[in-house]
Regions:
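Formylglycine-dependent sulfatase
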Residues: 2, 7, 15-16, 21-188
């Protein structure tokens, strides 16, 4: 008597397995945009009536908008490290803005958000201003790929010699030379 019940239960489980597997692939995309010196009220999706931000507004309307958030630091390098690690930046090795050529950098053994996402099957990418070390694209300090990014396209701090046609972008550890256009369009 128990055998037909177990057989029916196994058939039910086996037939629902493809549905469960297909839903496992329906994870949301995660896009984090970090901008230096951007305040809560600077975006029109948060109420600014002077500055228009239609592309960010569209992302906000189709995704999740956070209304209670804090920066781990008022300057760029530590705020990036705090966001990636979830820790107080000085505990991760970065306590201030990092000038080019400086020895300060995020500790290589930090457990970062990209590492966590990779462990759950996400592909990870970083594009734009890195600024988590002073010796960018040098073996003396860890680089974006060491913190869980499958692909990265970045500068250490600012585009140079200017934001138009910058020459200092690096893709996965290799210099790309001059890139035509404005850096904000190139990294997007």
């Amino acid at each position: 008597m128990l055998y037909p019940f177990i057989k029916a239960l196994l058939i039910l489980i086996a037939s629902s397995l493809p549905l469960a597997l297909s839903r496992a692939d329906e994870r949301p995309n995660i896009i984090i945009i970090l901008c230096d010196d951007l305040g809560y009220g600077d975006l029109s999706c948060y109420g600014n009536t002077v500055i228009r931000t239609p592309n960010i507004d569209q992302l906000a309307s189709e995704g999740i908008r956070f209304t209670s958030f804090y920066s781990s630091s008022p300057v760029c390098s530590p705020s990036r490290v705090g966001l990636m690690t979830g820790r107080t930046p000085d505990r991760a090795g970065v306590y201030d803005w990092i000038p080019r050529g400086n020895r300060m950098h995020m500790s290589k053994n930090e457990f970062t958000m990209p590492v966590m996402l990779k462990k759950t099957g996400y592909a990870t990418c970083m594009s734009g201003k890195w600024h988590c070390n002073g010796l960018f694209n040098q073996i003396n300090q860890p680089q974006p790929g060491d913190f869980g990014f499958d692909h990265w396209f970045a500068t250490q701090n600012n585009a140079a010699p200017s934001h138009k046609d910058p020459e200092n972008f690096v893709r996965n550890g290799k210099s790309v030379g001059m890139s035509k256009g404005f850096c904000c369009q190139i990294v997007a």
